[in-house]
Amino acid sequence: MRPVCLIAACLSAASGQTPAIPTAPITTFGVTVVDSVGLRGDIYLLRPNTDALPKFQKLKPVGAVYTSSLNIPPRSFLEGFPGVTDRYEWFAIDYHGTFWIDEPGKYRFLLASDDGSRLYIDDKVVINNDGIHAVQTETGTANLKTGSHRIRVSYFQGPRAGVALVLGVARPGEERWRIFNTKEFLPPHKPEN
């Protein structure tokens, strides 16, 4: 069963059900202003005709962007990354950060992208959506314990045309998808004495 992601919803081709992704502000790939509670995305330039995620450890980033969520529905992309590079095709972004789980259990994740992407939680692949393709959605699950967890979303864009990168989550017991936002997964605040 492979769900197909549309801008605000994900249609399950097999069941006909529509688990809606709540409307959230559409974001860019990020900004150059450091966000200490968000994701840092290192930007890499790729060779034309790259057809899969690169081995990032063999590349040197040209800059970084920061964001607390990945909500870039399918759209055209010609603006590049102001302040970093004007590249709008043949690039990759390797996002990484941490998030906090208060409620342990089975979390469902949704990753929609055009072109390839991969989601890692605590260095384990949860979703593999790699390759050159139009917008495509994959889902996966992770059993998470209370505490801090590492998250990584690797993404690449091949030839110019459209882009998309949406990361959704459903907490244990939730039916509806929501956009994953690091600001909703912060550690508890400890008051100072």
Regions inferred by a protein language model and the residue ranges of each:
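Short low-polarity hydrophobic stretches
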Residues: 3, 16-17
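Extracellular/secretory pathway-exposed regions associated with glycan biology
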Residues: 17-108, 112-193
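Hydrophobic h-region of N-terminal signal peptides that target proteins for export
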Residues: 8-16
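Sec-dependent signal peptide recognition
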Residues: 1-7
